[in-house]
Amino acid sequence: MTINKEGLRVDACSGDPMSIFGLWYEEVLRVKSVREPSAMVLATCDSENRPSARVVLLKRYSDAGFEFYTNLESRKAREIALNPCVSLVFDWRPIYKQVRVEGIAEFMDASESDAYFASRSRESQIGAWCSRQSMILEDRDVLLSKIELMEREYEGREIPRPKFWGGIRVVPNVIEFWMDGKHRLHDRRQYSKNIDGTWTSVYLYP
């Protein structure tokens, strides 16, 4: 596939940032060289305002926000419980585009988490049960032994969702679209959500 650096001009997009995101996301999904188009950097802060960041996978997006699933005892989930203000970054270099999101993270309903967990592969379900994410692992064999035990325990049976695993939705209040331009004259357009739910957009210097 030949990449067109001019691409979809930011100033030609609609006034709905989620529609723009959808167009860009569909574009990057078609680029075979992008191994994880759903990868996004999630930045959080602890109670002392010390930041941390990691890559998570976008599982769904809608007007309600950007959704991912994780161990709810992990560092990111603990920090979100203390401070729900987060940031996301989608870095799509092969198509010369980036999306930055600022928003409020909220824990999703159990029914939503149950439905998504049921759709996962059996191996991923077992992995969710056996991984004490971010905790110290003395030896990898310990984890593999837990997996083997659970495989035997639930052989031929449905695996329920662990209570410590679920979904988080980032409700955006700022979305910025960045696109590479010649001579570093990049396109940047920032959308900010108004109290009534509408969006106001401005252009930013590159």
Curated annotation (Swiss-Prot):
A Pfam family matched by this chain, by name? Answer: PNPOx_N
Q: Which InterPro entries match?
A: Pyridox_Oxase, Pyridox_Oxase_CS, Pyridox_Oxase_N, Pyridoxamine_oxidase_dimer_C, Split_barrel_FMN-bd
Task: Quote the record's cofactor note.
Answer: Binds 1 FMN per subunit.
Q: Name one GO biological process term.
A: pyridoxine biosynthetic process
The UniProt annotation places FMN binding at 54-59, 69-70, 75-76, 98, 133-134, 178, 188
Q: Which UniProt keywords apply?
A: Flavoprotein, FMN, Oxidoreductase, Pyridoxine biosynthesis
Note the HAMAP family from the entry: PdxH
The molecule here is called Pyridoxine/pyridoxamine 5'-phosphate oxidase
